[in-house]
Design a protein with these regions (language model features):
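Flavin-dependent oxidoreductase catalytic cores
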Residues: 1-244
Length: 244
């Protein structure tokens, strides 16, 4: 296990199709100190897919870098996590929030929210088999009728995860509604492991307001960084900034 501290950080979210290495370097140049690679399919990493293995690659500029994987089978998750650690990942994150049909039909991503006990076993085996911290990223549930994020968060913590990222929408909502920071705050209060809040952080003042009001340990920024990669600098300096 590394000494990775998941508190007091602003993370660049794992952005599928957007968070490639050049983009991450751009964010680093504008103040981002914690980066994550694009989601990688664990089973493809295990098969040796070049394109998937490329998602585990970090640049020397990325001093604090994590890899996110999508997995349904513990053996694949562990092997992919070990491969990520061997390539310099400081931690490995399990995606339990991706709403895309191709992901959920394979039993990965948001599907795992519907099977908390299976998710717990998966996380426990990852924690046991991967030599760096294991984290989990979830949504609030499969739908508003299946809002079980508190249960999922408890299971994840009991399985040994080092931290939990919570995106404030359900799988069904995708991005159709505003992120529910009241729900994120509730989960942060219920858990002892660091909870990282994610969703609708588009400005430096939203970042500070939501961080303080919710009591989360850290923030994770996705679309806000795609809109302006220098948002990390703005958050640190507490003022708007425009590149010239």
């Amino acid at each position: 296990m590394t000494g990775m501290d998941f508190r007091g950080r602003v993370f660049l979210a794992p952005l599928t199709k957007g968070g490639n290495l050049p983009f991450r370097r751009l964010c680093v140049a504008h103040g981002c100190r914690v980066t994550m690679g694009e989601m990688a399919y664990a089973y493809q990493v295990v098969r040796g897919s070049r394109s998937e293995l490329a998602l585990l690659r970090k640049h020397a500029d990325e001093a604090c870098f994590g890899v996110q994987i999508a997995a349904s089978r513990p053996a694949d998750a562990v092997r992919a996590g070990v491969a990520a650690a061997e390539r310099g990942a400081g931690w490995v994150d399990l995606n339990c929030g991706c709403p895309i049909h191709d992901v959920v039909r394979r039993g990965m991503g948001a599907t795992l929210l519907q099977k908390p006990q299976r998710l717990g076993r998966l996380v426990a085996e990852m924690v046991q088999g991967i030599p760096v911290p294991v984290t989990v990223k979830i949504r609030l549930g499969w739908s508003e009728r299946e809002d079980n994020a508190s249960e999922v968060a408890r299971v994840v913590e009991e399985a040994g995860a080092a931290a939990l990222s919570v995106h404030g929408r359900t799988r069904e909502q995708r991005y159709s509604r505003a992120a529910d920071w009241v729900a994120i705050a509730r989960i942060a209060a219920e858990r002892s492991i660091p909870v990282i809040g994610n969703g609708d952080v588009l400005t430096w003042f939203e970042a500070h307001d939501r961080w303080q009001a919710s009591g989360v340990a850290s923030l994770m920024i996705g679309r806000g960084a795609l809109i302006k990669p220098w948002i990390f600098r703005e958050i640190e300096e507490r003022k708007a900034w425009e590149p010239t």
